[in-house]
């Protein structure tokens, strides 16, 4: 008698959570293996699935932005992880941000209650047997025994970079007589808290960052500290130049406190506008917790408190969580993976998420969707699917499987990954809109493969 179809998913981060759900939705039994809380990672704080360890934001909502287009594609494909993000969204201007505690708890409960999902809390130290259909979604913090087995299997050393998380403060400890609520260019409903700096305050703050003591990074060569450019520590930005932070996370443009006067008065605007602005984004549904946007850091915790309390409005800030830095591991995917996310040398083994070399939450979810869908199809005796390269989700999987291998580095969603449009469109907004329209149209055949959308 033939065995019932079955898939194993290793890792219950964003990619693994999505992959396990897609397998179960296809009617295939799935075992989801997660090492937390048996073994903790350097960056996680809970044992819930799909824990967001860096920001609580999935990026821009608008579908004429790269991150927003990817989110919209995933909604149309029936993504549990993105649908649940919509359910547990918190105000964030034009971005999709979530109450991370409630969000992860809802996803954990959804999988725990699904009759086709078996959850095993243990550390997987080896790749499963070759005949077992498996999704590898252990993420950039894959435990060392499994990482070593993966190196033996691929015959290649893994790649790595260093990532960091931002601090979080209690909202009621922010001084709103100094800080003010607003969204950049008044987009949204004043969803951010903004801490303005004059030039003297900014320069003193930068100097303090440069002089602050950093925490020691363990288990790596200090001469090979590669950072991901999209998530640089704030102290690294400070080192790169006097104005680097002002043109990055501390840019003041588009932010105005009505207490300064009439923004339409040119003289008032010139006299009162901030030299730099630190933004805080709501972290939870109730607005009690706020994270410092773009303030990934590896400073020692005592130094973080000392330096960050120099920010106007944060002089008495109470820190719920300090920033941390950790090593992220990823595969040399162009040498190893097909666009279906199957390993070339073992088609029953698929990879998903940041370990494949994509960057960003939505990109991890997209990889989980495709790997889970294809694992289920393999279990059912069907051919795996390949997403169109004209879609953002497909462009990412084609990139990680087909990119030049020299110095392969993680890639976030961006319109530069998409094939050229048939016609040249000079206006950027119109061009991005055309990319969106083509992507969503080309995605339509994939939607027929999916059952009804469900959210937690």
Swiss-Prot record:
Reaction(s) the record says it catalyses: uridine(54) in tRNA + (6R)-5,10-methylene-5,6,7,8-tetrahydrofolate + NADH + H(+) = 5-methyluridine(54) in tRNA + (6S)-5,6,7,8-tetrahydrofolate + NAD(+); uridine(54) in tRNA + (6R)-5,10-methylene-5,6,7,8-tetrahydrofolate + NADPH + H(+) = 5-methyluridine(54) in tRNA + (6S)-5,6,7,8-tetrahydrofolate + NADP(+)
What is the protein named?
Methylenetetrahydrofolate--tRNA-(uracil-5-)-methyltransferase TrmFO
Sample GO molecular function, one term: flavin adenine dinucleotide binding
* UniProt EC number: 2.1.1.74
Cellular component terms per the entry's GO annotation: cytosol
Chief place where the protein resides: cytoplasm
Question: What keywords are assigned to this protein?
Answer: Cytoplasm, FAD, Flavoprotein, Methyltransferase, NAD, NADP, Transferase, tRNA processing
InterPro entries given in the database record: FAD/NAD-bd_sf (IPR036188), MnmG-rel (IPR002218), MnmG_N (IPR040131), TrmFO (IPR004417)
Q: What does the UniProt entry say about where the protein is found?
A: Cytoplasm
Read off the Gene3D superfamilies from this record.
Answer: FAD/NAD(P)-binding domain (3.50.50.60)
Q: Which species is this record about?
A: Synechococcus sp. (strain CC9605)
Q: What does this protein do?
A: Catalyzes the folate-dependent formation of 5-methyl-uridine at position 54 (M-5-U54) in all tRNAs.
Q: What is the lineage of its organism?
A: Bacteria, Bacillati, Cyanobacteriota, Cyanophyceae, Synechococcales
